[in-house]
Design a protein with these regions (language model features):
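Adenosine-nucleotide cofactor-binding segment
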Residues: 2-83, 138, 159-266
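Glycine- and charged-residue-rich phosphate/anionic-cofactor binding loop of Rossmann-like
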Residues: 66, 73-74, 252-257, 312-318, ...
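Conserved N-terminal Rossmann-fold NAD(P)-binding element of oxidoreductases
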Residues: 136-145
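N-terminal Rossmann-fold NAD(P) dinucleotide-binding loop
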Residues: 143, 151-152
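Glycine-rich phosphate-binding loop and adjacent beta-alpha segment
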Residues: 3, 20-21, 37-43, 83-133, ...
Length: 396
């Protein structure tokens, strides 16, 4: 509200709705409202179930439009976790951006793609591909056909932009076809998923989507094992096959700077784990309408990767680089951001504070444990020394 935006909060209680109203929110949508409380779920697998899932979210979209004069969200800021994320993405208006910085309940994220398509050239411009950057392209997904018109167009677009390209094909025959087209040095290498499977045998898995994961809080050991299996059986074999073609002096692991994803399959979990941390972009150019996509949330938010689609963007943020911290400090100094006072707890209450955060029952956004401060509200080192001196004098 302070920046001239109309903010609607997605909350979990009437009390939180009242609180954000006092902070200037234009409205709120309570996830626990009986009209749609059962709609906040992950996206199902089957196409017919996906259509029903989307219809179940229409009342939420209608409520958003009612509170905003008929509009959906241009921007969504999310951190609530795997059951709220899909509806948060559904609330996005055309060409909207969703950014998220955490997940309080589950890391297996899913969403339904939106309408709209564009050209590979347009998406490379949006992603600001620079000459010399490493690019991975999926070719021939969802088909055994040798000819992939969009894939060939994307190869030409990357070649024109000066990218260092590796192509991943579904089959050996597709690999041989791409190699026969005479792209020369424009295509550094062509990797067949079929060949990786043949070499690695039972140790390689190329899943149709990111497998559902156990609850990280209640089944921690099983959750960690599921993550490890995905890394060992999918990421390492595939990443190694791609990386050997893209390694350079400043990129020894061969991370792609940009990955051209395809709407016809769901390899988003692999792509968002493989693309370069902090600057990597995963882009789509085809229509993703009515299809489900899945990814492992920490790889996007903690590594600040971006997913660029024809009519939507997902951006992870973790406030862990110097540029973002400097920009935040500038905005605070200019009065554009107001820093909420932290909840201060004494040292002996640290276990209870940790438990409250784990259970998602904590009261404040930030907690500070007071180990040695004589009182709160001190603004300088001199004030701190004065308070310490006063305490020492009183002790005598």
């Amino acid at each position: 509200a302070r920046n001239g935006l109309s903010a609607v909060g997605l909350v979990s209680s009437a009390e939180r709705a009242q609180f954000i109203a006092t902070q200037g929110a234009a409205g709120s949508i309570n996830r626990r409202d009986p009209r749609w409380s059962q709609a906040f779920t992950t996206v199902p697998t089957e196409a017919s179930a996906i259509a029903e899932w989307q219809r179940a979210g229409e009342p939420i979209l209608d409520e958003m439009r009612r509170q905003t004069g008929g509009r959906l969200a241009d921007y969504v800021v999310s951190h609530a976790g795997q059951e709220s994320f899909p509806r948060s993405f559904q609330l996005l208006a055309e060409h909207g951006t969703l950014t998220f910085y955490g997940a309080t309940s589950g890391y297996w994220f899913s969403f339904v793609g939106k309408t709209g398509a564009t050209t590979p050239e347009d998406m490379l411009r949006r992603a600001r591909l620079r000459a010399g950057e490493a690019v991975l392209l999926y070719y021939g997904v969802g088909s055994r056909d040798l000819l992939d018109a969009v894939g060939l167009q994307a190869i030409e677009a990357v070649r024109a932009a000066g990218g260092r390209l590796v192509v991943a094909t579904a089959s050996d025959a597709q690999r041989e076809f791409v190699q026969s087209l005479g792209f020369g040095d424009a295509v550094r290498g062509v990797v067949s998923i079929e060949e990786i499977r043949r070499k690695e045998g039972a140790d390689f898995d190329w899943p149709e989507a990111l497998p559902a994961m156990p609850d990280a809080k209640r089944e921690t050991a099983r959750f960690k094992e599921a993550v490890r299996q995905f890394q060992e059986r999918t990421m390492k074999p595939f990443g190694g096959a791609i990386g050997r073609w893209l390694r350079s002096a400043d990129n020894p692991r061969g991370y792609p700077d940009l990955i051209i994803e395809r709407a016809g399959h769901d390899a988003l979990a692999t792509s968002t784990s493989l693309v370069k941390p902090f600057t990597g972009r995963v882009v789509y150019c085809e229509s993703m309408q009515d299809r489900r996509y899945t990814f492992y949330a920490p790889q996007v938010w903690m590594r600040q990767r971006r997913i660029l689609m024809p009519t939507a963007t997902i951006a992870g943020t973790h406030l862990c680089n110097a540029y973002e911290v400097a920009r935040m400090n500038d905005m605070i100094a200019a009065g554009q951001l107001e820093v909420s006072a932290p909840t201060v707890v004494p040292w002996e209450e640290l276990p209870a504070a940790h438990q409250a955060m784990w259970d998602n029952t904590h009261a404040g956004a930030n907690y500070v444990v007071n180990h040695a401060l004589p009182r709160t509200g001190l603004r300088s080192r001199d004030e701190l020394y004065q308070e310490w001196s006063a305490l020492q004098g009183a002790a005598r």
